[in-house]
Amino acid sequence: LRGRYIYGDYVTGNLFVFDPGAGTAATPELLTTVPGGDVAGFAEDRDGELYVLRLAASRIEKLTPAPAPAIADPFPARLSETGCVVVDGRGATPTPAPALVRYTPIAPFWSDGAEKDRAFTPGNAGVARLSVDGDGDYRFPALGVAMKTFRDPADQRPLETRFFVRHADGTHAGYTYLWRPDGHEADLARGGEAVLGTSVQYTLPSRGDCMTCHQEAAGYFLGLEAAQLTAPIRKSLEDQGIVASASTVTRTLVPPFGSDELALRAASDLHSNCSGCHRPGGSGRGDLDLRAEATLAAKGCDRRPETSDLGVADARVIAPGAPERSVLALRMRRTEVRMPPLGSRTTDAAGIALVESWIGSLARCSN
């Protein structure tokens, strides 16, 4: 680490490192994550050893080298080499390999209008399976993989294929492949590259960006939880031995833009797009719990915002009957210091309208 710049994220606990000598080509790399976050500063001792200062925990912790993994685990340079996607080399729509299980969440995450194909594998067919924790999040065994391919809705051209992986040593990491313009192949990216589709344009996330949202508190694998799958699909996966029984999970989300009750649809949309960070133990600011089952009080109903009121008089996180005074909705409308903070350049007009309609329908802060 000598000669390299190290910095940390107070909220997530992610520590990054980059080479300042690389100039504008410098790409931050995720060094490690301090459980619980709370990284306030760094210090060196007389031997040059590095320490992390944690404010709320009142702790000084030493950075020590991690043991080298027993087996190197690099990702292939080309998507076709992963074995997870069928790439015919002629520009046909890529499809997940037969060994992967396809799925569609009930309440999809907003990604600037891009369409997505999703699949996963426990990583050791016939032996390993996904477990389910008390929150209903599926927990992957070592070598488990989730994959998502983004397509441009205007011409169905593949733009990007992302992987989120639990490695053999138990660590998690995200990787992404950028599709070539001819759609014949995709190449491993470092992050920061521009995606220029016909109707969708955005910037590829870095591996550090992936870990900002894919946190332990939300089970790491966002979107893969019992509540995001219909009961028949859950039962089918359980019967096949792919996932453990989620019989204790009673929560199921609803399609945000379907015909269910307004409150349920808004709760599902917020759960999908916001609760990865805004939940107990998550990195979201404001001490909010935006999981679908959380109470209105936990979601910030009639609570003054802890960070910024955005210049709004008498602002609340959720102001019953007044979306124009509700910071929750106002953050969704912004393109800077916004919610969600990563993974999107444009706002979700339909999602904003849904949440504002729900807030407008509230007469008081009782579920």
Could you say what each language-model-derived stretch is?
Residues 1-145, 151, 157-160:
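Sequence/structural signature of beta-propeller domains
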Residues 36-37, 54, 68-72, 80, ...:
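Sequence context surrounding c-type heme c attachment/ligation sites in exported
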